[in-house]
Amino acid sequence: MNAPRPHDLLWGMPVSALPADAPQWALDVLAGAQPVVVRRAICDHGWVAVGLRGQGRTQRFAALMRLVDIQRQQGPEALRGPGQSPWPALQALASVAPVLNASGLAWGPTGGAGYQIATGIEVLHTGSDLDLLLHTPQPLARAQARELLDILDCAPCRIDVQLETPAGAVALREWAGFARRVLLKSDHGPRLVGDPWAAQERAA
């Protein structure tokens, strides 16, 4: 099993692993054998930072999971939506898949769309955005980012893409803009950087 990465879905976290102040809905999530989502944070050896999601944006809970409890692991790259769907987010996923496949880069849905595809639990609604993760181990020119964003903005719903770099993640929409520095999300927290791929930024 590969080391868990941000946005991976993990199954196997026991209810007993939750702290005493965990809300009842979080206990219900684990009791129902639903997965947790890997989040960015520094953890002690043998642990991974995860998040639990319930119904709606207000039901989110941060926790820690032991690596030995992982029974199954699924990354966004393994998820693909159904060919037909009434949900705009999944319609958008189907419409942009050929473009992203042609890029040659690993990618996949995260957020509500990824969770629904992986679990079969309907968490999307007609106003849901589509969240995507695009692995960019090599720098993506800002002009290329703007071209890709122009294509994605023609989809049936808003699409938010996180570019996963060796240093962390940056929003495609922000990288396609003209600001000199952009917000990089890393295990050490968010910070503004000029180049999300630069080794010196990772060491900062």
Curated annotation (Swiss-Prot):
Its EC number is 2.7.7.66. It holds the Pfam family MdcG. NCBIfam families: malonate_mdcG, PRK01293.1. The active site is at residues 129, 131. The gene is mdcG. Transfers 2'-(5-triphosphoribosyl)-3'-dephosphocoenzyme-A to the apo-[acyl-carrier-protein] of the malonate decarboxylase to yield holo-[acyl-carrier-protein]. It catalyses: apo-[malonate decarboxylase ACP] + 2'-(5''-triphospho-alpha-D-ribosyl)-3'-dephospho-CoA = holo-[malonate decarboxylase ACP] + diphosphate. HAMAP family: Malonate_MdcG. It is an enzyme of class 2 (transferase). Keywords: Nucleotidyltransferase, Transferase. GO terms for molecular function: nucleotidyltransferase activity. The keyword Nucleotidyltransferase applies. Belongs to the MdcG family. This is Phosphoribosyl-dephospho-CoA transferase.
